């Protein structure tokens, strides 16, 4: 398959421009042989790098309207969608990405998720590495790293929706429009961690970046508080299976403290 059939689209906007140098430092460290054209979406700001082209949009207040403008400027069959705070943490196998891209054509898929969150609902005959994200699955579509058929992604986005509204509503819309053509991997094809939450650095991300010799300027973007980190850890530990067996009065007490 021709390399210009897939472009990498990093969705972002100007308020997150302080993250771009760090994102691309991690990106090119772990995917140094990326053969695909890379696009960075913003509003007006630019990022100067020989391997990165800019996509500009009007100053919309929502993710979806910006994404529509960005994606409409890309002329490719497929796009690999990522967000600007996905910090790559392991070397990307370019041959594996190319093989997964071939499966998009072979099985006429509209989306192939490269990070298993959530895992596929069921397997695919003859394909041990990918499975189906079935209709009705929670977060069937989201903004984790995914190879999209560009026209399908544009079809699922609605102007005015926030990123989180897109993830919820596009999953519902995809049930009718793309019932059997959304798949995902069982193991990460691209390994990364999310670095930003509610506009602040995750402390865990800062520790990982420090091991890489990367120290973000916290005067530009602060870190979450230790309390917020602890709360997130507890909420993650108290996952849905645990919450389901807790008595109501215990859940109500926990909700007061941890907002879940």
Give the positions of each predicted feature.
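N-terminal anchoring/stem segment of glycosyltransferases
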Residues: 1-59, 70-73, 77-78
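Membrane-proximal basic amphipathic "stem/tether" segments
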Residues: 4, 11, 215-260
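Short beta-strand-to-loop acidic/aromatic patch adjacent to the donor-nucleotide binding site
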Residues: 77-87
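Conserved donor-nucleotide/metal-binding helix-loop-beta segment in metal-dependent transferases, i.e.
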Residues: 91-120
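Short, flexible, basic/aromatic active-site loop/helix in glycosyltransferases
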Residues: 124-138
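Catalytic core and acceptor-binding pocket of nucleotide-sugar-dependent glycosyltransferases
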Residues: 141-204
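Preference for solvent-exposed, low-hydrophobicity sequence contexts
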Residues: 184-186, 193-210, 215-228
């Amino acid at each position: 398959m021709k390399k210009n059939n897939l472009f990498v689209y990093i969705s972002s906007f100007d308020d997150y421009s302080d993250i771009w140098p760090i994102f691309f430092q991690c990106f090119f460290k772990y995917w140094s042989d990326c053969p695909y054209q890379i696009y960075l979406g913003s509003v007006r700001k630019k990022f100067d790098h020989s391997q990165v082209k800019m996509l500009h949009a009007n100053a919309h207040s929502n993710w979806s309207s910006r994404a529509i403008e960005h994606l409409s400027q890309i002329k490719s069959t497929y796009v690999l969608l990522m967000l600007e705070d996905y910090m790559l943490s392991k070397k990307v196998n370019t041959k594996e990405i190319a093989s997964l891209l071939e499966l998009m054509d072979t099985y006429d898929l509209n989306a192939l998720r490269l990070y298993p969150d959530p895992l596929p609902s069921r397997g695919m005959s003859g394909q041990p590495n990918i499975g189906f994200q079935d209709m009705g699955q929670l977060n069937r579509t989201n903004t984790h790293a995914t190879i999209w058929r560009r026209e399908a992604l544009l079809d699922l986005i609605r102007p005015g929706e926030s990123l989180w509204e897109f993830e919820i509503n596009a999953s519902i819309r995809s049930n009718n429009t793309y019932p059997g053509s959304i798949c995902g991997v069982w193991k990460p094809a691209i390994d990364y961690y999310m670095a930003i939450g509610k506009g602040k650095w995750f402390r865990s991300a800062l520790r990982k970046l420090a091991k890489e010799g990367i120290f973000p300027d916290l005067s530009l973007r602060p870190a979450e508080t230790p309390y917020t980190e602890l709360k997130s850890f507890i909420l993650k530990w108290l996952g849905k299976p645990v919450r389901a067996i807790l008595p109501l009065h215990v859940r109500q007490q926990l909700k007061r403290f941890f907002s879940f």
